[in-house]
Amino acid sequence: MPTVDIFNTNRDVVGQLELSDAVFAVPLRPHVLHEVVLYQLAKRRAGTVKTKGRSDVAGGGKKPWRQKGTGRARAGTSRSPIWRGGGTIHGPQPRDYEMRIPKKVRRLAVKMALSQKLIDRELTVLDQLQLEQIKTRDFAAILDRFELSKTLVVIAQPDEKLQKSARNIPNVKVLRTEGLNVYDLLNHRSVLLTRETIGKIEETLGS
């Protein structure tokens, strides 16, 4: 069973915490992470882009000139794709990018990502994370103290002071445990958790 040091906001070790093997000791299978990241990115796509083909472009119903006798190349419509103002050949059309991945696989991928963060020592656990006021400088000072950059902060409960203090700091994102996902875990170098957050994550994913 892996253990981690628990810090206060001054970076003093105040204890240790045993982590669940079912959540923080899951062997890495890169292809599972890859599939789930593709699934998440695909769900973000609207799939509404559309170009007009020759049958969609307005006009072009009349033959531009007679078939023979003008010396010009034959033409049946002024909306041919080779004409200026004509339709587009093989342009993008509306499509559904949806992928289906079982919920068990998505949960497994989150556990793998958390386990890898622990192995890479990119997981920082605080006893608690509470700000006295909405102050970006105060929260930035905590991150600097732990030498954290591009950080994902996962909280167990809504915290307006923390969320508003963090939103103007570049490369810092605050998520509730309900929104914890593989893409954000992999896209951020460091993950900042609290003791309460870990308890909630283990309760959700450990079953």
UniProtKB/Swiss-Prot annotation:
UniProt KW keywords: Ribonucleoprotein, Ribosomal protein, RNA-binding, rRNA-binding
Region (Disordered), start-end ranges: 50-96
GO molecular function annotation: rRNA binding; structural constituent of ribosome
One GO term (biological process): translation
Pfam family, one: Ribosomal_L4
SUPFAM superfamilies (alphabetical): Ribosomal protein L4
Top-level division of the source organism's lineage: Bacteria
One GO CC annotation: ribosome
Stated family: Belongs to the universal ribosomal protein uL4 family.
Subunit structure: Part of the 50S ribosomal subunit.
Task of the protein: One of the primary rRNA binding proteins, this protein initially binds near the 5'-end of the 23S rRNA. It is important during the early stages of 50S assembly. It makes multiple contacts with different domains of the 23S rRNA in the assembled 50S subunit and ribosome. Forms part of the polypeptide exit tunnel.
Full protein name: Large ribosomal subunit protein uL4
Organism: Syntrophobacter fumaroxidans (strain DSM 10017 / MPOB)
